[in-house]
Amino acid sequence: MSGKAQQQSRLKELISRGREQGYLTYAEVNDHLPEDISDPEQVEDIIRMINDMGINVFESAPDADALLLAEADTDEAAAEEAAAALAAVETDIGRTTDPVRMYMREMGTVELLTREGEIEIAKRIEEGIREVMGAIAHFPGTVDHILSEYTRVTTEGGRLSDVLSGYIDPDDGITPPAAEVPPPVDTKTAKADDDSEDEEAEATEDEEEAESGPDPVIAAQRFGAVADQMEVTRKALKKHGRENKQAIAEMLALAELFMPIKLVPKQFEGLVERVRSALDRLRQQERAIMQLCVRDARMPRADFLRQFPGNEVDESWTDALAKGKSKYAEAIARLQPDIIRCQQKLTALEVETGLKIAEIKDINRRMSIGEAKARRAKKEMVEANLRLVISIAKKYTNRGLQFLDLIQEGNIGLMKAVDKFEYRRGYKFSTYATWWIRQAITRSIADQARTIRIPVHMIETINKLNRISRQMLQEMGREPTPEELGERMEMPEDKIRKVLKIAKEPISMETPIGDDEDSHLGDFIEDSTMQSPIDVATVESLKEATREVLSGLTAREAKVLRMRFGIDMNTDHTLEEVGKQFDVTRERIRQIEAKALRKLRHPTRSEHLRSFLDE
């Protein structure tokens, strides 16, 4: 029997035993595992898979009562299938430790999307966003904020695309691709380091792309309708209150008009944060009340969760608890002022927002459901297009970033593409996403690949210079001079020289040299600041000769010369400083110095130093 078959047989036996006795112990699992699996994380993964099959794994054998809760299942076919799956996973785990291969393996389990699948996911994303917008519309102040932002950009000369991204109309048809231009992308940064695509990128930059944002006329109609309905809703709320049927109908009509408006992420997140902020304040006070009741007053948690909902701002609720006959009534009475203080903060929140506590929770619940729906759909779209990122990232290897870093940056661009994808344009998602992925990768290379960061605009200039330099090399058969490059690029010569200097890549001094790699680049570079051994030896000999000559003078004369010329000292000294040291006048020091120098000039003493002077 082969090793793999024997391994599968042992795993089958393990699973069958687990199904028969209703459990397994860690010791039994360990005995049946292959010897090459020793990593704790791998063992945990296998135990998790066994648990997923309905077999509990315990430290030791459980008692009989616990076993009665589990039903034994001895299906032979199921045991064989589970053993085969477990063996395959174990083999895979044992072999693969490379993160790239593990990533590729996980990526390969997701099927590619068809055009219909992309549209279906895009519609689910839009539906989730519509639900969020519909919930947000019921929160006071959100619609007014967006209307004020729209008024600001239209009256102060701002860009409509700073507020509005588009519209989400489920009934709109899909435009044929021929009727549309390719999806707009900020291509100024998408061409930073791709020599083969420089010309195309620069052509795109030269044609200053007109902003293809929302149509101002349609935006005026939509926001005008929302503003009119907002005014009607405000009057109905003021006249009848939020619980009146007419007011509810007007609010639903406002939400229907507000839902199709697709805001830019910054504005959308701002509205969501408004709702979350109110809910966070609400939760904070609810937690404080629960701690007072459950932790401090020893009220059973189940009792609190049953009685508190609906009584968040009812101060008589604590009176009833305090006057009750429960064990915790006395403690509640003692803590009643603190509980009422928290309830008053909740009441202030209701007054501030104009909503009841239950309404704030309901708005947040509907908003969270819509966000979760959109998030799940976006996750599906991203996972189904990870292969596209790999195919694009492969073209940018060996440019200063690791392959996994390129994949990561490309995935960030892919997520941006999912956020901005408009299936109604008629293009497949891959056509649209390619530009965003390439933009993210090239921008990251420009920002991160070099040890010394160079701005993106300078990277573009360097790439253009390199391309023109190669063209001129082919035309002339030699490297062009800076003057010739400046003439071709219509740039001053000094700027060309500056760009050429900036374009140089730094290299490590520890770069190995030679086949054996036993020496480094730094070993071959001259250190101009280092003194040669001969100079060092000469200086040391001069010091010794000077000390020997000075030893032939009197102690006073030698010290005066040492201080005046800074010999064996940090610095030299003036006549006045030396005079203070000896407590004599500066004239006397000058005389001592002159006498000492005359002695040193005598041939018997000066011959020791004259050889150094000749050198």
Swiss-Prot record:
Residues 549-602 are annotated as: Sigma-70 factor domain-4. PROSITE patterns: SIGMA70_1, SIGMA70_2. Residues 575-594 bind DNA. One of its GO terms (biological process) is DNA-templated transcription initiation. InterPro entries: RNA_pol_sigma-70_dom, RNA_pol_sigma70, RNA_pol_sigma70_r1_2, RNA_pol_sigma70_r2, RNA_pol_sigma70_r3, RNA_pol_sigma70_r4, RNA_pol_sigma_70_non-ess, RNA_pol_sigma_70_r1_1. A motif (Interaction with polymerase core subunit RpoC) lies at residues 405-408. The keyword Zinc does not apply. It comes from the Bacteria. Residues 460-536 are annotated as: Sigma-70 factor domain-3. It is found in: Cytoplasm. Keywords: Cytoplasm, DNA-binding, Sigma factor, Transcription, Transcription regulation. Pfam families: Sigma70_ner (PF04546), Sigma70_r1_1 (PF03979), Sigma70_r1_2 (PF00140), Sigma70_r2 (PF04542), Sigma70_r3 (PF04539), Sigma70_r4 (PF04545). Residues 381-451 are annotated as: Sigma-70 factor domain-2. Disulfide bonds: none annotated. GO terms for molecular function: DNA binding; sigma factor activity. One of its GO terms (cellular component) is cytoplasm. Residues 194-212 have a biased composition (Acidic residues). Transmembrane segments: none annotated. The keyword Transcription regulation applies. Residues 166-216 are annotated as: Disordered. Sigma factors are initiation factors that promote the attachment of RNA polymerase to specific initiation sites and are then released. This sigma factor is the primary sigma factor during exponential growth. Interacts transiently with the RNA polymerase catalytic core. Belongs to the sigma-70 factor family. RpoD/SigA subfamily. NCBIfam families: PRK05658.1, RpoD_Cterm, sigma70-ECF. This is RNA polymerase sigma factor RpoD. The lineage of its organism: Bacteria, Pseudomonadati, Pseudomonadota, Gammaproteobacteria, Pseudomonadales.
